[in-house]
Amino acid sequence: MGFLKNIKFMKKGGSNPLLEKLKLFYNALSAPFIQREEEAEVIVLSLLSNEHTLFIGEPGTAKSAIVRRAASLLKAKYFYYVLNKYTEPDELFGPIDINELKTKGIYKRRIEGKLPLAEIAFLDEIFNANTAILNTLLSLLQERIFINGDETIQSPLISLFSASNDIPDEVELRALYDRLLFRHHVRPVSESKLKELFKAGIEIELKGVIEEEPVMEISELKKIQEQVYFVLEKTKDRKDILQQYARLIVIFREQGIQVTDRRAIKGLKAVAANAVFNGRDYVEPKDFMVLKYVIPETIDDFGKVAAIVSEEIRLPSRYLKDLEILERNILRLRKEIRRLPTYDFRIISYSRELLIIERKLRKIAREAIDDNEVLNRVEKLLEIIGEIKDSLVSKSSLYGKDL
């Protein structure tokens, strides 16, 4: 699945201004962060789908920062809170209006600046939500309504983003987990990107976070959401797409991945959002790759779902898992070779291993000729191999002979 910065949004007669705005929004959202393009993608998909998201992973991976930036770039009303086991409803939904209670006997909350009036929200440690909070939160997520005394308020909430270290086991939390359509396992920045991360971090420490002007309005986002529903409507008549989608759902279930009927239906909405996200008003089989953010129930499912979809739709992106393994081996070799003394006998075996990896990379590049993401990763890994070769040459004149 390609990222928006690599997509040209076109429609008959010229460019589409709204989709150009969406591309600008995505680029501005991901720009300050190192290796957080995928998280930005999930945020955009969630907003386009008018659905909610769970980020799973350890603290300190910029989850709340990138969501806050999304709200800022949209000039959206934003609410943020870290939940614990003792969080009271007042903290999320507003304190009781004592005046209303005294004068009218109505149990009403003062909701200004609280979750019911937010357009984008982030709840950290969401599964700390207790029983007193759960029912109200579920109504807000599912129906976008908040009962406030004798008044039913329609919440403007577009998407709620949340974070947790783990997936909940408790039965009472499963309904909440199910309401979060998008699920993404956030990993720390890879070793190859650490220098960039440090530089960016130092820049923030010295100059602070620079706030950018909004690049898109909520009203424009809602118009693009209408396009998602238009694509979803068209998909009803796409027998080829529905047949392939049904096959995927069957395979997921056969592989032991639990997919409820409701999640399967919602998954089609995510697929339609991905088509719009990539500048199309129709679904293609490659849009099914978005299911890696929708179908997983456990941590182990994330890799499994991506592999199943890649294999079934024959996408070049099935090579991404292979590239991750090759990258780990390359970085291991670089680390071990740096420690070698000159003329060490292991240089020959390392050279041969490096050559095998290089051949595998070039084979992947030939087979995935149309996948820019794969080709870019191959190119970067080949550059690292080139650097390692230079290091080997400096350690032993035998290197060239043994390749």
Predicted regions and their residues:
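Conserved NTP-binding/hydrolysis module of P-loop NTPases
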Residues: 84-104
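Conserved alpha-helical scaffold flanking the Walker A/P-loop in AAA+ ATPase domains
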Residues: 42-45, 99-121
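Walker A/P-loop
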Residues: 44-85
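Basic, amphipathic alpha-helical bundle interface domains used for macromolecular binding and assembly
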Residues: 205-303
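Canonical AAA+ ATPase core
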Residues: 99-104, 120-136, 141-217, 228-231, ...
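C-terminal engagement/docking regions of AAA+ P-loop ATPases
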Residues: 7-9, 254, 258, 276-403
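Post-Walker A helix-loop "phosphate-sensing" segment adjacent to the P-loop in P-loop NTPases
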Residues: 72-81, 98-101, 143-145
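Pre-Walker A (pre-P-loop) alpha-helix and adjacent loop at the N terminus of AAA/AAA+ ATPase modules
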Residues: 16-58
